[in-house]
UniProtKB/Swiss-Prot annotation:
DNA-binding region(s) from the entry: 31-51, 100-130
Compartments, record wording: Nucleus
MF GO annotations: DNA binding
Protein name: Tigger transposable element-derived protein 3
Residue span of region Disordered: 402-426
Primary residence: nucleus
Keyword Transmembrane helix listed: no
Keywords: DNA-binding, Nucleus
Location of the HTH psq-type domain: 3-55
Domain DDE-1: 167-360
Domain HTH CENPB-type residues, every copy: 67-137
Family: Belongs to the tigger transposable element derived protein family.
Amino acid sequence: MELNTKKKLHALSLAEKIQVLELLDESKMSQSEVARRFQVSQPQISRICKNKEKLLADWCSGTANHERKRKRESKYSGIDEALLCWYHIARAKAWDVTGPMLLHKAKELADIMGQDFVPSIGWLVRWKRRNNVGFGTRQVLVPLFPPEAPPAVLPSQAQPPLSLKDFSPEDVFGCAEVPLLYRAVPGRVFECDRLQVLLCANSRGTEKRRVFVGGLQAAPRCFFGVSSEALPTSYHPDLAIPWSEWLAQFDQDMGQQGRQVALLLASGVVEEWASLPGLHHVRLLPLSASSTTPSLPGSVILAFKAHYRHRLLSKLAAMQSGKEGTSLAEARASITVLDALHMVAAAWAKVPRQLILSSFVQEGLAPGKTPLSLDKDTEMSPVPSGLSQEEFSHFVDLEDEDPGPRVCKEETGTEDSGREEDGFEPLPTKADALQALCTLRRWLECNSASPELFEKFYDCEVEVEQLCCL
């Protein structure tokens, strides 16, 4: 008779856990009865119920390994997700993806993100298991007789194309690429200061996607010490927006939320990306071929650019008044790409929900009967002092002007001028952050700041002090 016998642990795969959830939802069986059926303990069934939402999100993502019993989170989740996006793009282009290619690409992505990471064979094996990835050429047996052609579908039996009426307003999204000269000032335009901004929001204005920005610089000096997750927007080192990568991330996010959404795009773009594999939760809806309306209403784009220009002029004015003798050109040259990303995020957050909702309805891009009436003051950012309404409106659309190539050559590298000899500036310490709080509070005290402003400062002070304690 064996005395020291250990009960063998029986772990359930993801597919079996989904069966457990379905059984509990569809029948009147108790957790104990389900546990006996699957030959596991009742606490294990209880944990499955507790993690129901996460398990369903993994199941719906389309990338999870359904037969895997345990899921370990990757230490380098950012690299993990970026490599998965690249892998889907490569497979969509019918590339023969190999292990060495993935290892090389993972190291390249880690360098771009500023992470000290060296991928190994073991890491690659675990990455493939986590994301249910397999690659390599497969031999396909050619049948002796060609398969019969499927019967033709009569027009009456064909499924009608999806339209806006098939989605709720919260699940209808529009997007637009917006060129932005992030350091432009009235009367001076520099082509080398160009960014490409991708904005996306739903027709209710209740959900704005994280801004995606493409830039000319692969690794700006101002990004030193800042992880990609800490950037206020997503950044891509190229003015050409990687649509397949962005769509794959959008689809993954919607899958985790268990949603089916529509993305409005120009008819030509929809035809180009219709064959993109892996889009399970985002349906591309084409605008009419004769339509000149962008999928994100023009008034929304104009409001975003107006808020950005207003914030830029305020920042330049503060720089000039803060240090005597600072010219407008010097203040403009000190604006970095990182400064621009922060101002882009702030400007996008400033676009009111009511404006987005009204604009979608007015242009017929969302289900609705009558557009909402908005005050003109809420549609545009207030005109900065020193400019007329006409001058500010022209300043907002400076991207339409044609800058000379000579100016672009003169402005190359102005952002990093004066720093090349000393290298990168040292990163601020916790002591520097606390001292900066003291300096800011003292300045507010000496300039008779309002109680409302002090309340905002106190909130910031508490957050910074808590970060310093970590």
